[in-house]
Structure formats: C-alpha cells, structure tokens
Design a protein with these regions (language model features):
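N-terminal interaction/assembly modules
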Residues: 1-141
Length: 141
C-alpha cells in the first residue's frame, strides 16, 4: 500500500492502513456526512492522504454497518446495545469484524491482535473488552 506526497510514493504497512481506516470510522461516527466528505476532511491528517485500503474498507463497512452491528450485538452482555459501546471501541470492533468476516486475506489472529493494539492506543482500558468480544466471535464461527 502506498500514498503519494509531493510526487513521491510513501509506503504504508497494513497496520498503518488499518489505523487510517479506524480513524476514518471514528471520525464518521460523529456526523452524517457522506463518506467522501469525511475522507476529504481527514486526508490532511496523513502524509500523502488516505490510502486506498482504508478508503475501500471503510466504504464497505459503511455499506454493511447494520449487519456488522447486529453481529457485534450477539456478543454483548444481556441488556447491552452497540450504542453503549464507546465510539473508539465500536470503530475498532466494526473494523475487526469486517476483516474477520469478509477479508480472507487477513488471518483472524492478525485482525484480533491489531484491534487490541488499536484499543490500547486509542481507548482507556478497553482492550480486554475488544479482545473478549472478538474472541467470542471467532469461537462462534
């Protein structure tokens, strides 16, 4: 994966591309703007703009958000809904559920590990929650 800055290619790792996708999903959770506007509003945060992987994954997640949220709901404690999950954790879970369910090119264990790392970086002590939900999801499949 690569982006361009001043005519030069910038190589991104899959982790960096995934982090861009997380940041787009998180940003999108605050507004009802079209995805294109969210991408445009956030592209300056990243050297070379937002990579194609992040844009593609976020677009697919937005298209399947209701289905993904319904899947997440199955693994919440009784009485909980996705609206109770913090915005950062929900963005992380949506990304990981999408990768696990729809992207055969990404091993489940990698999706879980990356999600836990994002949770450690962007949430206050919710990495165990994210890990538990994803573990239950993987065991159910």
């Amino acid at each position: 994966m690569s982006n361009e800055l001043n005519g030069e290619q910038i190589k991104l790792t899959r982790s960096e591309a995934r982090e861009q996708a997380f940041m787009l999903l998180f940003s999108k959770s605050f507004d009802d703007e079209p995805l294109e506007a969210t991408i445009e509003d956030n592209s300056e945060m990243f050297e070379g703009g937002i990579c194609g992987y992040a844009q593609s994954v976020v677009s697919s997640i937005e298209d399947k958000k209701d289905e993904i949220d319904a899947e997440i709901s199955k693994f919440l404690k009784k009485g909980w809904t996705v609206s109770r999950i913090s915005k950062p954790s929900l963005a992380i879970l949506r990304l990981a559920f999408y990768e696990i369910k729809y992207l055969d090119s990404v091993p489940d264990s990698v999706s879980v590990n990356e999600a836990v790392e994002l949770a450690k970086k962007y949430t206050i002590d919710e990495s165990k929650f994210v890990n538990g939900i994803l573990g239950a999801f993987i065991r159910s499949n």
